[in-house]
Amino acid sequence: SIHRDYYPTDFVASMTLASTWDREAAFKVGQGIGNEVREFGLDWILSPAMNLIRNPLCGRNHEYYSEDPYLSGTIGAGYVRGVQSEGTAACPKHFVANNQETNRNNNISQVSQRALREIYLKAFEIMVKESDPWTIMTSYNKLNGPYAVQNYELLTTIVRDEWGWKGMYVSDWNAGDDAVAAMLAGNDMLQPGQDKQYQAILEAAKSGKLPMEVLDANVKRILEYVIKTHNFKGYKYSNEPNLKAHAKVVREVGADGIVLLKNSGILPLAGKKVALFGCTSYDWISGGSGFGGTSVGHYTVSLIEGLRCVGYEVYKPLIGIYTQHLAAEEKRLFPNGRPPFSLMPPARADEKQFTAEELNAAIE
């Protein structure tokens, strides 16, 4: 076998993109991502994540756009159009009312019809009607009773009948508890697929519990997606997307998305000497983990390097103190080395605690 490293662009976080309030920026980011997916030999990207930011403790808020349904739907639509302009499938998720990670596999979202229509569905409705995504991912949670993946009113009555969407549904990984109910509700593809699901669907089809016309419709939508893909069409991918052009997009959109909430005369800094406190000044958190994980890129600029590049002098004694502290924390947390990929966030270093004497000595 041949091993190859891939270096895709680290595009801006979704909430940064939404902070631009710019449809064209969303299109450019989506277009860049769609291009890289295509040129690296893939057909489908499982994004954008469009759940509303309703709780600041939600562990995947960095993947979402906003607490505003209109802004989320509009930016999401621009992103989807951009991705699919490159012939790559987008997959808006997690549909719907999947707004927390705590107990996410079994959480019951009890939502009134008015709140559902005006808040939780609205972002998806705008996105569907303005961009026509090829696929949509259903969520883990239950919605007013049944699991979202098994909710006929949600998947068929609202989205297909009312909104007129004709694309393919895919479940979140191992969502729901009844494969046949998911098929009957209108969910087309179950991921990642289990033997017990195959058997349940076959038995239900043979017994008549799962009508063939329903199964045929599910399969038809999957095939309609497949025949649009790069690989089905025999596209010869290059492994060389235009990373320089995409880096320019990141620079422009990242700058446009910066929001200064409060200044109080502190910025710009008057002096040129700075002292950095806090572990993440030296060991930054680049993003989420698990399903929403990001890897630290090979081409990064640390906070210290960035400050020095623009002429600031970073206080050296603190660098040494935090370097030693982080090394000790690494040994404490991972005595046998860091574990491989996990769906749970890695343990983080405890903050360095300074006594008054240590603090005075550090800043003298």
Residue ranges and their predicted role:
Residues 1-364:
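Glycoside hydrolase catalytic-domain context in secreted enzymes
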